[in-house]
Amino acid sequence: MKTCNLTDRMKVKMIMLLFQILAISTLQSVSAYIPDRYIQENVAVRGKATQSDQLQGQWDAFSHASNAIDGNQDSYFYHGSCTHTSGGANPWWRVDLLQEYKITSVTITNRGDCCGERITGARIIIGKNNGLNNPECSTVGIMTAGETKTFRCSHPMIGRYVTVYLPKTEYLHLCEVEVNAMLPAN
């Protein structure tokens, strides 16, 4: 009978492989018995939206804050599903969720027919008051025209107010804002 001499390195690799197999099988069996406690849901559609100001003139009817929570991701401004401010200093858009939620991310659909770069640098802030000093969830980097992008908070944030704040002199336009919150599963 031949004996197999394993080197120390081979023994360590085999032990590590066994631990990995054991860990995976244990996690799979445990997760089968833990029910999902939460579901993710867009709670913005239940809220009330406001903004710092509104584009005036022939397009003011297309510029309302509530357009960003109408459930329509159409990114073409002239179809009437986007918001638009007047281009002043530090514009903001806010949704009052009417109650506090545990928020995990915010999804924004950018204007698609032009001007996609305008939103660059916007801050997404979430908190319990309607001011501009609430904690930051994320900062908007470069978004292309018409792009829909999800901005994840580094940890779930408790808040009633979600604000998109643009700290510069610029137009702020949003075609949809979804606030993704954790709700108890039924």
UniProtKB/Swiss-Prot annotation:
<comment type="similarity">
    <text>Belongs to the fucolectin family.</text>
</comment>
<protein>
    <recommendedName>
        <fullName>Fucolectin-6</fullName>
    </recommendedName>
</protein>
<keyword id="KW-0106">Calcium</keyword>
<dbReference type="GO" id="GO:0010185">
    <property type="term" value="P:regulation of cellular defense response"/>
</dbReference>
<feature type="signal peptide">
    <location>
        <begin position="1"/>
        <end position="32"/>
    </location>
</feature>
<feature type="binding site">
    <location>
        <position position="111"/>
    </location>
    <ligand>
        <name>alpha-L-fucose</name>
    </ligand>
</feature>
<dbReference type="GO" id="GO:0030246">
    <property type="term" value="F:carbohydrate binding"/>
</dbReference>
<comment type="subunit">
    <text>Homotrimer.</text>
</comment>
<dbReference type="GO" id="GO:0045088">
    <property type="term" value="P:regulation of innate immune response"/>
</dbReference>
<keyword id="KW-0479">Metal-binding</keyword>
<comment type="function">
    <text>Acts as a defensive agent. Recognizes blood group fucosylated oligosaccharides including A, B, H and Lewis B-type antigens. Does not recognize Lewis A antigen and has low affinity for monovalent haptens.</text>
</comment>
<dbReference type="GO" id="GO:0005615">
    <property type="term" value="C:extracellular space"/>
</dbReference>
<feature type="binding site">
    <location>
        <position position="118"/>
    </location>
    <ligand>
        <name>alpha-L-fucose</name>
    </ligand>
</feature>
<keyword id="KW-0732">Signal</keyword>
<feature type="binding site">
    <location>
        <position position="175"/>
    </location>
    <ligand>
        <name>Ca(2+)</name>
    </ligand>
</feature>
<feature type="binding site">
    <location>
        <position position="70"/>
    </location>
    <ligand>
        <name>Ca(2+)</name>
    </ligand>
</feature>
<feature type="short sequence motif" description="Cell attachment site">
    <location>
        <begin position="111"/>
        <end position="113"/>
    </location>
</feature>
<feature type="binding site">
    <location>
        <position position="72"/>
    </location>
    <ligand>
        <name>Ca(2+)</name>
    </ligand>
</feature>
<dbReference type="InterPro" id="IPR008979">
    <property type="entry name" value="Galactose-bd-like_sf"/>
</dbReference>
<feature type="disulfide bond">
    <location>
        <begin position="82"/>
        <end position="175"/>
    </location>
</feature>
<dbReference type="GO" id="GO:0001868">
    <property type="term" value="P:regulation of complement activation, lectin pathway"/>
</dbReference>
<feature type="binding site">
    <location>
        <position position="67"/>
    </location>
    <ligand>
        <name>Ca(2+)</name>
    </ligand>
</feature>
<feature type="binding site">
    <location>
        <position position="81"/>
    </location>
    <ligand>
        <name>Ca(2+)</name>
    </ligand>
</feature>
<keyword id="KW-0964">Secreted</keyword>
<feature type="disulfide bond">
    <location>
        <begin position="137"/>
        <end position="153"/>
    </location>
</feature>
<feature type="binding site">
    <location>
        <position position="176"/>
    </location>
    <ligand>
        <name>Ca(2+)</name>
    </ligand>
</feature>
<dbReference type="Pfam" id="PF22633">
    <property type="entry name" value="F5_F8_type_C_2"/>
</dbReference>
<dbReference type="InterPro" id="IPR006585">
    <property type="entry name" value="FTP1"/>
</dbReference>
<keyword id="KW-1015">Disulfide bond</keyword>
<feature type="binding site">
    <location>
        <position position="84"/>
    </location>
    <ligand>
        <name>alpha-L-fucose</name>
    </ligand>
</feature>
<dbReference type="GO" id="GO:0042806">
    <property type="term" value="F:fucose binding"/>
</dbReference>
<feature type="region of interest" description="F5/8 type C-like">
    <location>
        <begin position="40"/>
        <end position="186"/>
    </location>
</feature>
<feature type="disulfide bond">
    <location>
        <begin position="114"/>
        <end position="115"/>
    </location>
</feature>
<dbReference type="InterPro" id="IPR051941">
    <property type="entry name" value="BG_Antigen-Binding_Lectin"/>
</dbReference>
<keyword id="KW-0430">Lectin</keyword>
<dbReference type="GO" id="GO:0005509">
    <property type="term" value="F:calcium ion binding"/>
</dbReference>
